[in-house]
Each structure stands twice: as C-alpha cells, then as structure tokens.
C-alpha cells in the first residue's frame, strides 16, 4: 500500500491553490492542495504501527511554524510543474529531513524545495503560455502550520487521511 | 465554514465502494468513501477549539467496534441514494447520538440509518434500472473501526481532513 506525508494549509490557501489546480493540475480531484513532506512510499500493513509511532515522534519534536507563500515558480526543465514557492523555514526543513532519515529512506533524487503544486504534467506550450503571467502575480500569504498528515492511496489514485499529527508538545 | 464528522473505512472497503461511486455518485471526486456521522454544519473559527475538544472526548468514550456491511439498499422514495447498509452497533449509534447531543444540534430531519453511500442524485430510471441487480449482490465485509475524522469543506465542494480522533482510551 502507498503512503505519503503531507501538510494541508488553511482553507483560504487551499481555495486559492484550487483556483489554479482546477485548470492546470490533473491531480485536482485526487487530493486537496497540500505540501508534500514525503513522496509516496510502499509499506506493508505490519510496518504501519512503527511508522505511525515514528511520524508522531517527529511531529512532536517540531513546533508549529509560519508557512509563507510568496510567488509562483516552476521546476522546468526538470518537470513541467507549477507551484507556489514556500519560504524556507528551519522547522519545515527539519520535518522533511527527519522524514528522510533512518528508518526512512533518503531522497537521493531531489533536494527539498518547499512548494505547493498548482499545476503538473503540463505540455511545454501550456507551461510557457502561462508561466510569465503567473510569475508576475502578486502572491503573498502567511499562516501557522500546526499539524501534518499521514495518508494512503486508494486504487483510483486518490488519497485518504489515515492520521493527523499535531506539531510540538501536546497541550 | 462547513465542517462534518465521518469515518473512513479500510482501503479494501473504500476501493469496493469507489467501484460503484465512480458510476453512480457525483460526489466521487469530492471526498473518499465514508460513513457520515454528522452532516455538514456551519462553524465560526472561534468555535472550532471547543468543538474539537468535544469530538475528542466523544471519541475517547467509545471503544473501537466492528463495522459490518451486508447489503446494498436505497433511501428511495425519500432520496434516490444507493448505499451499503451497515449493521447497527451500539458503539456506532452512541457516536452518532453524542454528535447530535448538546452542544451539537439534534438531527430533527432523519433518524440514524448507518450507511456508506455508493450512489446519489440518481434519476428514477437510473435507480430502478440498477437497484434490483445491486440488491442481489453478495456484499459481506467486516472490519474494526478505530478512528473518526473531523473535516472541512473547500469552496469547490471537496473535503479536507482537519483532525483524526482515535476511539477509546489512548494507548
């Protein structure tokens, strides 16, 4: 079964992201707008409890932090993806690092670029037609993130939340 | 903002439900297959913490329980909805009752019929064409439910999980 770890921003930021995803992201209906903290990884059912425990520890070890979105950018030419760029923050980096440290596999393929995807699998023409205009857009939003989520993937490609983990120590 | 409380069954039951929802449920892409415990209700942001606290208490007060699905049925003529009928269970009824007891509003409109929707807003012809065949289907599935979820609705009608609540006392 495929699992992943993500954070869902607030409704206003999700609504804003969806206004783009609707047109540019074929995953629009598969999962709400999110910041991926750990790409899909395979897990046997018997491994789940120890992974849940580890994600809970990681979440407890990182305090709630400000998430700041400040522009539209692309991974082109690596991929034809459009995203809201997220300001680097030590807490966000720490979450990502911990989720890619033993017992989890490292991500050898990419280094962490905090982002919220608003378009993907675009043709070169779609990307270049829109990129200039979108890069000019004034995007400025800041909010506090206080939770992350572990999700699993259904056969139709959509994602269901398995568990929420609050950041920082329990009240 | 609209909130709701639901339980998501296991992946196998969700995949089975989606094989029907794909054809019969226009909400297919808005939310994964679920059992509604509390229909959408409006909440101001400042009311959220006390509601979260109350849902957490309710979840703690009910132990994990078996969820049994045993046939396809319909709410016709009240509504043209198709669903997997869920065997009544005191724990499930208790969750529903608590979520409709002060500070929450009672549901004056319907009494609780535990179900997992697989089709809705069907025309009379669609419903009657398929109902006989679906009612004959051998549906038999049982699993343990150990968590419920509080969700909120985005502007596009889709739902994001806000928080997971484990049933019973914390380990």
From Swiss-Prot, chains A, B:
Quote the EC number: 3.1.-.-
What residues sit in the active site? 34, 115
SUPFAM superfamilies to which the protein is assigned, alphabetical: LigT-like
Q: Which domain of life is it from?
A: Bacteria
| GO molecular function terms attached to this record | hydrolase activity, acting on ester bonds
Q: Where does this chain carry the motif HXTX 2?
A: 115-118
Keyword Hydrolase on entry: yes
Q: Which family does it belong to?
A: Belongs to the 2H phosphoesterase superfamily. YjcG family.
The name under which this protein is listed is Putative phosphoesterase BH1439
The taxonomic lineage of its organism, from the top, reads: Bacteria, Bacillati, Bacillota, Bacilli, Bacillales
């Amino acid at each position: 079964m495929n699992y992943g770890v993500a954070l869902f921003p607030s409704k206003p930021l999700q609504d804003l992201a969806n206004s783009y995803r609707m047109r540019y992201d074929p995953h629009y209906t598969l999962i709400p707008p999110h910041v991926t903290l750990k790409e899909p990884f395979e897990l046997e059912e018997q491994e789940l409890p120890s992974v849940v425990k580890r994600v809970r520890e990681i979440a407890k070890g990182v305090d709630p932090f400000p998430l700041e979105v400040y522009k539209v950018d692309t991974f082109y030419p690596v991929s034809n993806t459009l995203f809201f760029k997220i300001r680097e923050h030590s807490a966000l980096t720490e979450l990502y690092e911990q989720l890619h440290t033993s017992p989890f596999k490292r991500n050898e393929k990419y280094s962490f670029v905090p982002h919220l995807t608003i378009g993907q699998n675009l043709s070169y023409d779609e990307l270049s037609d829109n990129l200039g205009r979108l890069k000019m857009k004034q995007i400025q939003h800041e909010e506090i993130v206080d939770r992350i989520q572990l999700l699993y993937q259904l056969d139709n490609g959509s994602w269901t939340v398995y568990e929420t983990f609050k950041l920082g120590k329990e009240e």
